[in-house]
């Protein structure tokens, strides 16, 4: 599936209720509630490589680390550095994933645990960065998504997630996350936008700041691309 994000910054309670009513009239399968945490970190300019320590006091390059922890990815955190390198971290052990409702898409293999090949963390990666890597990364923003709903349509080939976005407790808009099956064999950016235009028109989705960009159009990365879109849309 490919994804796109829309942020409606001028959404009002009336427009939000109206949009939910519109989707409900399409008789979707309700997949429950969800929330997310999106954090933005900037590199510590005083943390420089040893080989540069004799000639530089601070780093001349600014780098950014983004972490996305959606509740539907239990115990997992998507990370993106400088919008070009992505990874998904999990703190769920494989043998424990069966105990989680609906399971966990990502988990640490039992063999890794038995051989000590894990971080040994019980917390998500974004918490680890914030608590243990402060000398390297400084948190700039913590954006929250709350009150989210998940709608499944078109026999599961279309998923629409909605969420209210907050920064420091201040409402910043309505987020709409669209995930659709990509039937095109050509992974060009122009072709990726076509199915979303169809969805926007068919379901009368309000227009707003939108991103369907990907890290590499020739090699799609479902979660890396999603985190990239969050970094572009939730840039306050």
UniProtKB/Swiss-Prot annotation:
GO cellular component terms attached to this protein's record: mediator complex
Keyword Protein biosynthesis listed: no
Localization (cell): Nucleus
UniProt entry keywords in alphabetical sequence: Activator, Nucleus, Transcription, Transcription regulation
Pfam families: Med20
Family of this protein: Belongs to the Mediator complex subunit 20 family.
UniProt protein name: Mediator of RNA polymerase II transcription subunit 20
Gene from which this protein is expressed: SRB2
